[in-house]
A protein has these predicted regions:
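Residue-level signal for inorganic ion chemistry
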Residues: 105, 142, 169, 242, ...
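Charged, often glycine-rich, active-site loop that binds/positions anionic groups
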Residues: 16, 20, 27, 188-203
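Short glycine/serine-rich loop segments
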Residues: 1-112, 326-333, 339-342
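A short helix-breaking turn/cap at a secondary-structure junction
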Residues: 73-164, 186, 366-374
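Short, well-ordered beta-to-alpha junction loops that form the rim of enzyme active sites
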Residues: 3-5, 10, 147, 181, ...
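Flexible, acidic loop-helix segments that line cofactor/substrate-binding pockets
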Residues: 120-126, 140, 145-147, 179-194, ...
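Acyltransferase
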Residues: 154-181, 204-215, 239-260
Length: 374
């Protein structure tokens, strides 16, 4: 089946002019998240046990957090890509699924993974032993990040979720250390927004060729139009520098994981938002409609402003997409209102086995919480 998403997967909620909002199954005044919101709602409502999803900046992990599900973004290169495109969003985007159990997550990962020679990012496959028989036999060193990489305020509920998970991991004999952000989160997010703009412009260039005409404002939603317009103005040399910065981010995190096995953060800063909570004001909408009239720097500032409120809601997820690391949202916390808000575990590239072994520890000790969990 096919599930609802925001147009081209640009948002951390699922709404749109075509099919409307995706409701959080247990509170229809709230959004199920995005961009894989329809998939999350299908799983959390019990329609299906597993639903395919993709994650270019948190689009699996964010709805997992809101819906009380397990959401794995695999390592770059783990899941097959192509043949139409081999580097979705320059490697930031990964395909996988939303699930309810670690068992299902492991099995799906084992059978979907591939060592893909023609891929620009081939990755050695995980063995059956590493996925199904590996267990944590010695204390882990876990870095705890309490602050937002975007310098935005972290909610008391997000802090509570981190503390609960940290306390549990500490009780199991692991060593946890509160650390500073290893990357410049604002800079990394700006590169991410620029990438989205350029890739949108490239996508519409192909669409124009297939349609035999130019794209118009009426062909797409406002936020998509703004991305399309701004992406056409970015210089090739600046895009090259952007991609080089991603390689530097990845190198920094590889060194970071020489000292730490895992990173623990909140998966989202808040539970599921209300429908319409991130609607843009009329002044900004007018500016976005006339995006082509602004300079490149002004356009990038407007893109940031366009996503500012929603980014503050979910500031923790984008960096693993840039570095290629595997990252996992698990349902370990309920807010005072009884709404899910997950935590996020991130490992070194290729270490999904470690992520899932730790997730299984939470699961076996009945640490998973949420309206749907069985």
């Amino acid at each position: 089946g096919r599930t609802n998403t925001p147009e081209f997967g640009f948002k951390n909620i699922s709404d749109g002019q075509l099919h409307g909002n995706v409701n959080l199954p247990f509170d229809h005044s709230r959004n199920a998240g995005g961009s894989s919101g329809g998939a999350a709602a299908a799983v959390s409502s019990g329609m299906v046990p597993i639903a395919g999803a993709s994650d270019g900046g948190g689009s699996i992990r964010i709805p997992a957090s809101f819906n009380g599900l397990i959401g794995l973004k695999p390592s770059r290169g783990r899941i097959p890509v192509g043949p139409s495109s081999y580097r979705g969003w320059q490697g930031a985007s990964s395909h996988f699924a939303l699930t309810k159990s670690v068992r299902d997550t492991k099995r799906l990962l084992y059978y979907l993974q591939s060592y893909q020679v023609e891929s620009p990012f081939p990755l050695k496959k995980l063995s059956k032993e590493s996925l199904f028989e590996f267990s944590v036999s010695k204390p882990l060193k876990i870095a705890v990040l309490m602050d937002s990489p975007l310098k935005t305020k972290v909610s008391s509920e997000a802090k509570a979720a981190i503390k609960e998970a940290a306390d549990f991991l500490s009780q199991k004999g692991n060593h946890l250390e509160l650390v500073e952000q290893p990357l410049d989160g604002i800079h990394s997010m700006k590169t991410y927004c620029m990438m989205n703009s350029v890739e949108t412009a490239a996508m519409f260039d192909d669409i124009e060729k297939s349609l035999g005409r130019s794209m118009e404002f009426s062909d797409m939603e406002l936020m998509t139009w703004a991305m399309y317009q701004s992406g056409q103005r970015v210089l090739a040399k600046d895009y090259s520098k952007l991609l080089d910065s991603w390689d530097q981010f990845a190198a920094t995190m590889a060194r970071f994981h020489e000292n730490y096995d895992l990173i623990l953060t909140a998966a989202t800063n808040q539970p599921a938002p209300f429908h319409g909570q991130f609607d843009l004001d009329e002044t900004l909408q007018k500016q976005l409609r006339h995006m082509g009239e602004f300079s490149v720097s002004e356009q990038q500032d407007l893109i940031w402003k366009m996503f500012e409120d929603s980014m503050a809601w979910t500031p923790f997820t984008h960096q693993p997409n840039l570095t290629g690391q595997p990252s996992l949202a698990i349902p370990t916390h309920l807010t005072k209102e009884g709404l899910p808000l997950g935590v996020q575990l991130t490992a070194a590239k290729g270490r999904e086995d470690l992520l899932l072994a730790v997730a299984e520890l939470f699961e076996k000790e009945k640490q998973f919480k949420g309206p749907v969990y069985h």
